[in-house]
Amino acid sequence: MIAVIFEFSAAPGRRDEYLAIAAELGKELAGFEGFVSIERFQSLNDPAKFVSLSFWRDEEAVRRWRNVQKHREAQARGRAGIFSDYRLRVAQVIRDYTRDRRAQTPEDSLKIHG
């Protein structure tokens, strides 16, 4: 599984424009092969700062999404002024477990928490 962490600051007065574009792209993501989930978070300290956290089956799915024309157009609009700054991180998920799904829980944690 791949995690894409997109941190960005919206330029003054451009927040709503970004959110509208994100909503449109969300429609494209629905049913996109290899897409798992996405969440968007807004900073409590700086209302212009956001983090978008998406999960993908594999890097090939990320590559295909990166090259979807509507996504490329949205990227260009972001770089042209919607974002005052951004940072993108792409990471391999090492473990994925929850309170109830424990298969990938580290042994030492299982010993303590079950």
Residue ranges and their predicted role:
Residues 1-50, 57-67, 82-114:
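Short S/T/G/P-rich N-terminal loop/turn motif that feeds into the first structured element of a domain
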Residues 74, 78:
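Conserved short loop/helix modules at catalytic or binding sites
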